[in-house]
């Protein structure tokens, strides 16, 4: 695990917007490296992004019905990002990164 300091509880202290913005940082890195043909760097960023999604799901507060819908949305994002990354679909990755931009704006 590359984010051990976050798995010790620091991630749970962040707001969902902060968590999603951090996921966005790694997804942008993965996309950038993939576009440059640096598959090794792209895969490391992709793995870090997956870890952050895992932490969001593990530490999420998804007890209410509206939060359960959000959990589904996060899982669907992961599914779409994984497919786009494995297919090297830069157009789809860009669209998914744009989705995450909205969380960075909330956080700012």
Predicted regions and their residues:
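Surface-exposed peri-terminal alpha-helical interaction modules
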Residues: 1-108
């Amino acid at each position: 695990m590359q984010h051990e300091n976050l798995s010790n509880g620091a991630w749970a202290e962040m707001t969902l917007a902060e968590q999603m913005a951090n996921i966005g940082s790694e997804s942008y890195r993965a996309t950038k490296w993939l576009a440059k043909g640096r598959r090794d760097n792209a895969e490391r960023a992709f793995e870090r992004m997956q870890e952050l999604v895992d932490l969001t799901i593990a530490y999420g507060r998804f007890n209410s019905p509206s939060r359960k819908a959000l959990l589904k949305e996060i899982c669907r994002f992961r599914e779409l990002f994984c497919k786009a990354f494995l297919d090297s679909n830069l157009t789809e990755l860009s669209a998914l990164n744009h989705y995450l931009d909205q969380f960075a704006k909330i956080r700012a």
